[in-house]
């Protein structure tokens, strides 16, 4: 294949035939490298195919060298160079050209997803870890990209478990949670839920999962352990990437630091109020201020505008526009904006500032998830319902599930909201409970996907529901009254349909007891 490199802003000629163009992109990686190009291919009939973003590295790049010294024209890159597509869609677009075109283009560009030996050599180069793998994990290259580059599928089947740490000085077996993901299932099985009352240890379980995956010196007896398999288990690592999401001001577990070099290990990103590390006084940094969260959002939206992330971000925003406030704010219009970086960030922050706190959290979280979620990512969310009303929570869960399916990832949500249960099947739900120091978990007895919230509440919380709130008031009134009419009169007739049904059931149960 004949290749020509075009300078930034220069377009291919209209009469191009049977050749490929690399359009120079000035995207900057950490002020160290400019390795990005856009690949456009013209067939023999002159039809153009925009393949997507690709980064090109060079063995032995000199200190201060920002761009690989590739020739302006070539048929095949020589062995000094190597390349990597920046998204699974890059390889899917190549597949659409047919296996002959795909294989020729990948070979001529020395693609490391096609050549595993070349990838292992490239991993030793600094430009690979800092630039080529900035938005891609090694697991994506060796797993999803490898499959697609050979015409294979893009989704994996997961089956794994997490065993919590054993309580100190206890003979009690720790709780063990099992998870399974089946590609293309309906309803989707890529989001799992831990539900239970406050204080049962849901947040502690998520924190243990985080430390078990990315804690540098963590011991299994302190943080627990994962076991399991996927179709692409690499280097004994179940997941390649972990994203932790929590906006609780009372979260006792501080975040771990993010990493710039992504050439090895499980990658980690934190989304929330807390900041990693300690201040000059040795104390944890204070939570992020609204202005700081706005800055985080401005930086993230700019990253989400690049390459294939832009289409994922647009789709997520459109799904969130099921909420009328998001729709009125036209948040999805951000994804189609072509302003320069400074103006774009300013517009994004202005839109962000006009939203309520709950809508800000959803928009920031979804944007950061689009930025950070890659192949084989585990997303851990702690009580997302704390800031969201039910319809917005449902829209967020659906957008998250859609993103995770696209990225071949898994989500685990800790919650006490039955609204979350409505969005997943019971095979993806663990009811968590605690007795003294013993934590246990069971599956729901009823199907949860699309079930009534009241029924789900009773299924999860059982007697806790009837011993609190309006249930207790109704039960006390029935025990002090002689009949249905008197109970209704006591509440001035201000009773909903469910309350009236509960009163009748309580009176019937009371009468049956008297007969005995």
PLM regions and their residue ranges:
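Switch/communication elements of ASCE P-loop NTPase nucleotide-binding domains
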Residues: 170-233, 341-473
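Short, flexible beta-strand-to-coil junctions
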Residues: 40-46, 163-167, 509-512
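Extended helical coiled-coil dimerization/tether regions that scaffold
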Residues: 117-186, 236, 249-257, 264, ...
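Generic structural hydrophobic/aromatic packing signal, biased to beta-strands
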Residues: 22, 39, 160-162, 176-179, ...
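ABC ATPase nucleotide-binding domain signature region
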Residues: 55-63, 67-73, 78-91, 95, ...
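RecA-like P-loop NTPase motor core
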Residues: 284-327, 332, 402, 419-422, ...
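Long, basic/Gly/Ser/Thr-rich N-terminal segments
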Residues: 1-153
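Intrinsic structural disorder/low-complexity segments
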Residues: 52, 58-61, 302-303, 392, ...
